[in-house]
Amino acid sequence: MERNTKITTKQIVLVGLLAALVCVGSGLRIKVPEAVGTSAFHLGNILCALSGILLGPWLGGLAAGLGSAVYDMLDPMYISECWLTFLMKGAYGVVAGLIIRCGKKDWNYGKATVAALCGALAYAVLYLTKTFFYSGMLMHGLTVEGAWVSVVSKLPATTFNAVVAIIGAPLLAVALRKALHKSRLSID
């Protein structure tokens, strides 16, 4: 059996739409100053998880990564890390998409919550690892102890963003899926 690997116009439009929403959601933020750099509470992670849940791993990861990277390119503070953001937020969408597509094709709120949780955990590990090695030790020249302080200072915002995404993305996914199905615009 041959697998259809063509990307449709509808899929391209959905990737672009969700990437734009991720970019805007990332911009809706409250910056928090820290000892080294800043952290932020924002809505981008909800939309990264939503991208993976609705579009699946590869297209959802692309939408999450592109939208987040575009936001970083628009902010001089983050532009130098946009390539890392593309990879890390892309992984967020990929992991959420892999979990939602694992097993039965049909999914519900519970499976969407597990997908958002796994995506959030994967992203948190990648983000805190980047904070320790890249931002802390490489870019700021911190000692190991200083890099750990930087990681610990990022934990509250990272945890808050993850919890909001774990709660919000499945609710949005179920509502959007139902509305799209009812209007015969199903994305499954």
Residue ranges: model-predicted function:
Residues 1-188:
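Loop-helix junctions at membrane interfaces
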